[in-house]
Amino acid sequence: RTFRVGRVDDVLADGARKTIQLEGKSILLSRRGEQVIAFDLTCTHAGCPLAYNAKGGRITCACHGGAFDLDGKPVAGPPTIPLTRLECAIDNGDLLVHISGTQS
C-alpha cells in the first residue's frame, strides 16, 4: 500500500532525518537532495521496536542491544539482517512511501 505522506519540503528538509508513523509502524525517513530513504523501525532480530538516536548516529534496539547504522546495516548485538528498506518516491513534490506486508 502506498501512502502520500505530504509535500516533501514540508515533511523533511534536505539532509534531515525524521521518524513518522504509518499504519502503526515507525518509519525513519532520511533525505539527501531529491532522494528520500525510508526504513521500517522494527528490529530484524526479534521484531522489537527500534529508536533513532540522532546524537549517536545509530538506530538501536532496547530488547537485546542490537544496533544498526544509518544505512540500515547491523553493527552491534544479535541482528544479522539489515533493516527493511521501504520504497519511496517523490511525485509532483509529494512524498510517497510504500509499505508491503513482508520484509524485503
Language model: regions and residue ranges:
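Short amphipathic alpha-helical patches
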Residues: 66-67, 91
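N-terminal pre-ligand scaffold of iron-sulfur
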Residues: 1-56, 82-104
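Short cysteine/histidine-rich metal-coordination sites, predominantly Zn2+-binding motifs
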Residues: 57-65, 75-84
